[in-house]
């Protein structure tokens, strides 16, 4: 469903013909629905938590149990199942190893990049940045100064921690569109998860509760070392009883 969003709050939007516009925070947005009705929606409401109805809708579309989706979220995002660090900023994990590998593949000198942008390769520093989330974004922003596309592709996004390098498997046209959708809502993060596992043939593993096969496909060859399959099974056992 396409929705047209117009900013109606009184805060300024600085625009320049030769530079990217900087969008300032707004108190509310006017949402125009296809039937031409308009409703006023607060900025906070745009990032409302996932509901049982959201889970049920996607589970029914995929032909799987709600508990299997919650199990994946539990393992990837933690028991809080939070998709956003703050409004407009999804929870992320900037992977330095993936970043360095993709830089080399693009012909970029990693040693020079590390010297000019040390923050992109630094360990998480909560004391310096104030929180885990801010520290992750500091690394992403520093990496983006080297290569915006590679930095986004080297980051795992949202409550299902989908790697940016998988954007093509999420039915989007670019990594920028992928990030834009990830930044919209937890419901959109769930939708991208559904697209991702459908395009990769992983739905059958969730249907069969084949946690080992799903963990291998979703998390890669190191899944066993980190016990992903056991954690998924345990999380499913918990949610299937609710």
Predicted regions and their residues:
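Generic detector of low-complexity/intrinsically disordered segments
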Residues: 6, 17, 32-35
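Catalytic glycan-binding domains that act on GlcNAc-containing polysaccharides
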Residues: 23, 28, 35-242
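Boundary at the C-terminal end of the N-terminal hydrophobic targeting segment
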Residues: 17-23
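Repetitive helical segments and hydrophobic/amphipathic motifs
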Residues: 12-15
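Sec-dependent signal peptide recognition
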Residues: 2-10
């Amino acid at each position: 469903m396409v929705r047209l969003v117009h900013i109606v709050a009184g805060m300024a939007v600085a625009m320049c013909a030769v530079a990217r516009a900087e969008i300032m925070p707004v108190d509310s947005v006017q949402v125009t629905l296809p039937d031409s009705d308009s409703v006023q929606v607060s900025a906070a409401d745009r990032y409302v938590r996932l509901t049982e109805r959201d889970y049920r809708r996607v589970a029914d579309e995929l032909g799987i149990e709600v508990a299997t989706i919650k199990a994946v979220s539990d393992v990837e995002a933690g028991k809080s199942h939070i998709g956003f660090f703050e409004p407009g900023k999804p929870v992320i994990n900037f992977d330095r190893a993936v970043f360095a590998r993709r830089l080399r593949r693009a012909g970029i000198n990693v040693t020079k990049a590390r010297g000019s942008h040390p923050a992109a390769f630094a360990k998480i520093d909560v004391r310096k940045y104030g929180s885990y989330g801010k520290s992750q974004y500091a690394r992403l922003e520093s990496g983006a100064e080297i290569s915006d596309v590679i930095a986004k592709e080297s980051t795992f996004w949202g409550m299902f921690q989908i790697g940016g390098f998988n954007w093509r498997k999420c039915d989007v046209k670019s990594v920028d569109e992928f990030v834009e959708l990830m930044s919209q809502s937890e419901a959109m993060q769930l939708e991208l998860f559904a697209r991702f596992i459908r395009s990769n043939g992983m739905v059958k593993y969730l249907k069969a509760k084949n946690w080992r096969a799903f963990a291998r496909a979703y998390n890669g060859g190191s899944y066993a070392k980190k016990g992903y399959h056991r954690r998924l099974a345990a999380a499913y056992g918990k949610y299937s009883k609710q």
